[in-house]
């Protein structure tokens, strides 16, 4: 089975680094029916940064606007999900490297039950090219380049 690849957007918000603030933000998203593909948080001095990758960016933007949450867009990346196998992530990184696309970050993990997932972040000016490269690698069996359709055979012209 081939890996599923889709473009994703990353958003960030800073809140006071106090108990239950992250819960308050996340419960607001839950109440709005927002599904998150990824979420992480880190302390930033007296503040805490919450980073999220929503499943539906348009719906997320609408919900945070209505709730008055000050999420800011940060970067664009690619969510890759598939069956676990040795070198699964490396296959995609190799394709990007061959096209001289710099990867600025990777978040990867085992999803359990033989599945894995990763988000690969690239520079904004490389998003379109990376999308083409990753989509092509998703369509080809592992370790092989996509097959190209052979041009139709030409008939030899007859001399009259």
Feature annotation, model-predicted:
Residues 1-160:
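A conserved regulatory-domain signal marking ACT and ACT-like small-molecule sensing domains
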